[in-house]
């Protein structure tokens, strides 16, 4: 699937280089954060409803789609963590080797549609003003 909604994916922890095996954990950002389509494979880290705890489901590198990850979290009475929650490092040291691998979040990619609609309407107004008055009034 090339088109469709995309969700934020990032490595499960960015501070693991500050603790543990320094040879294994060379840096804090193993993967840059990206937005991926549903069938991209990533690990599953779930947050409690109030966002105060995180649990890893399975192992990383993960192969779950976004839909599968959501189902796994819901099956545990939890939900996928948001991008903001993941970046607080709440999920560090919760297992599955996911500190160093990509995991799903519930954060969707911001849509360009509102921006494109605003730009289109702005151009329509400018065109109308130029054609009606021969003078651009802003």
Where in the sequence are the language-model features?
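Conserved hydrophobic ligand-interaction patch in extracellular adhesion modules
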Residues: 1, 61-107
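Disulfide-bonded cysteine-rich modules in secreted/extracellular proteins
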Residues: 3-9, 53-69, 115-117
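Residue-level signal for mature regions of secreted extracellular proteins and peptides
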Residues: 5-7, 39-40, 53-54, 66, ...
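Extracellular secreted precursors and ectodomains with disulfide-bonded cysteine-rich loops/domains
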Residues: 11, 44-45, 52, 58, ...
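Eukaryotic intrinsically disordered and solvent-exposed regulatory patches
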Residues: 29-33, 66
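Short, structured beta-strand segments at or near domain termini in extracellular proteins/domains
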Residues: 33-55, 96-112
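Low-complexity, Pro/Ser/Thr-rich intrinsically disordered segments
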Residues: 110-138
